Amino acid sequence: MANLSRLFSVKIGRQTTAAQYGVFGVGIILAPGAAFFGLKYSTYESAKIENFNDLYRVYTSADDAASDGMSGDNLLAVQAYFSQSPSPDTLVVGDFSAAYSKTMIKLTGVPVVGAPSGTKATIGYVKGGEYRYAKFNGTAWSGSAGATADIVADSGAEGQFLVDGRIVYLEGAEVVHKSSTALSSAVSSAVAAIKNQYNKFFMSMTTSRDLSIQKAIADWTESQIDKMAVFIDDYSSPTWATDSITKYIHDKNMAGSFAVSTRREKNFLDAALAGRCLVMQPGSETWALKTLNAAQADDFTETDYQKIQALNGNTFEDYGSGITVTYPGTCGDGESIEVVRFCYWQADRMQKDLATLFVNRNKIGHDMPGYEVVCNKMESSLKAGQTAGGIIENFTDENGDLIRGFEVVRPTMAEVGATQRIKGDLTVKFKFYLRYAIKHVDAIGSAMTYGI
């Protein structure tokens, strides 16, 4: 039977595959005892172990985190993140309980919603492969088998208890991070487990000020090609000058981590600064001179500041005249935070643009026209970085020569060997000039008398 295709055959192949760009604007709070599973007094006794497989939650507001059951320092950090202006869209919270072998909790006096007045606190936790629960009547804990042995009163502080297990529900009490038992050797695997479940985050922070945990997070972060971390540096520590997170990342010349120093407890400058700056396009921002909401400024002396600055640390201070800002915005190695973030973004952009180009072409020839296609795509990626503000615009120097913000060097046929052609390998060199931010101005002038 005759068919129109005999005369006019039309076939359309869809070449619409696009590599997904990385995430460079979302923070993650690594929260031991996150307890974000939404349990309530009416449901916590009937929960099943399989309810707690997830190690993360994604939030668009602090209220959602509170509704899920987050409390104490973990919730304060979430609130600091979302309190910035403009407010960030997304925050990931990772259940970082594996970083503690035992978790300290403290009674808050806040009533357990829906419970009889005699119930002062309730808890649900996972130990091994078993879910356990208990409630506190003001004198003793009671609940599922083994619970009374797992929850031990702290002899050094009334109303505090050490819990042997991963806390997944908690009311009437909050986690006391500084009194919990840190397990720094488990940090890398704990973060990796969260990442394996959900990798759409860029900047890590933690509610724990335990130095061993902070160091382990910094070490893990430095090994990643698309992650950064920000830490609260406890300047009140008597060992700050010799052993602090600021000194650690400085001495190890870390580019992927930075710290903000404070003397104040429950002052989550890390979350506030991340929430303030991650909303901005990489390359368009500086992390210095930023005002922060839901955060307290420190009153450092000039000597204090010079000590912190010498280790490439950062502060949030009141400079008078209504100016309370962060400064100087540097990573452990002394590089500007925004420069490191931009370079990660630019590398990801170019890689994904090249991937998208090649998977949507039947063939790109290993010859001059093919090289031009590749170089044009790389220039397009660099132009995007220039438009974003991370690469300087073209300018004319003092000699009248045009200086380009970026350059892609075209390989010649003679430069490409036969072995490269046979294997399909190609090396293309490029360079660009970073567009740094002005953070300090010295204005020097003269006052003169006319006529002299």
Regions found by a protein language model. Give the residues of each.
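Surface-exposed assembly/interface segments
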Residues: 1-452
